[in-house]
UniProtKB/Swiss-Prot annotation:
This is NADH-quinone oxidoreductase subunit D 2. It is a peripheral membrane protein. It is found in: Cell membrane. Belongs to the complex I 49 kDa subunit family. It comes from Streptomyces avermitilis (strain ATCC 31267 / DSM 46492 / JCM 5070 / NBRC 14893 / NCIMB 12804 / NRRL 8165 / MA-4680).
Amino acid sequence: MTPTTETMVGIGGAAESTDMVLNIGPQHPSTHGVLRLRLVLDGERIQHAEPVIGYMHRGAEKLFEARDYRQIIMLANRHDWLSAFSNELGVVLAVERMLGMEVPERAVWTRTLLAELNRVLNHLMFLGSYPLELGGITPIFYAFTEREELQHVMEEISGGRMHYMFNRVGGLKEDLPAGWATRARACVAALRSRLDVYDDLVLGNEIFRGRTRGVGVLTPEAVHAYGVSGPIARGSGVDFDLRRDEPYLAYGELQDTLKVVTRQEGDCLARFECLLEQTHNALDLADACLDRLAELPPGPINQRLPKVLKAPEGHTYAWTENPLGINGYYLVSKGEKTPYRLKLRSASFNNIQALTELLPGTLVADMVAILGSLFFVVGDIDK
């Protein structure tokens, strides 16, 4: 019997190339917190993307149920640590609506002023960190210099650099310190004079434009499907801003100053341009609020409250145009001193869902550019 020769073909030579699963995170330089992305790759192309969230979940909504209406303000400003004042504001607006409470005019204008200054602080962080994620280290030094100056102004009035705890049900903790308005106006003017550096240093940089123009295009249909809001939605041509379309605080009287910035391209560059122009407009709104406060006569800054504050039985919904998008607060009360339920609708949670639409078909090298252009805070996603 003559021996036969057999030829074996290895599976690697006969089969088609298989997709590779790549985990980005949970700890990664391009995320503000701990976010994990599970990517399925075909070569250098992303075939499928799945954001894996929950690493910073602390059960904020459940904790609200064990705190009274004064204490929940302390919890509300922590999930998005870059928009602390705006988060406090949404909660107190919901409680005040439940109580049918009128807030003094001086408190309304001061809240509007501080909300816009907080918006500038938030945007400066991303205006500096986004170019850093694409390899440009210089802008973040400018951004943090401006933030430090503005943080001193916010710290002087509230005592806190990040978690202000300045809102109260019925108004604010206290009136503006003597001379604070003058210092705030000087800070706003200085910031405005130096914001042009981003036009020259960032938007004028051909490498930055090459990395962002036409990359990560989000369609208006996807914006509506995923509930995306804020500068990300407006960068895709969705012309909606609660401050104009459903005014709260003093925004109804600021319609001549308020400018809703939109772009039609829907790419990373459009989102960055919206953020930058929105920062300019927030400084204009802050100036308008300072002018109005200077005209107001001295008066109360808050309402007198009972020792034990109880909301009547019922439910209400309040929403605000936070720096990162729309935040909603659904409050259910059983007539007790603690909320029966307080549901948070955070902007970052909805915005990050769009990654499943944005990433497939793009290069791995563009992943960080797209991820950073969504301007999210992981604590705001996980709560």
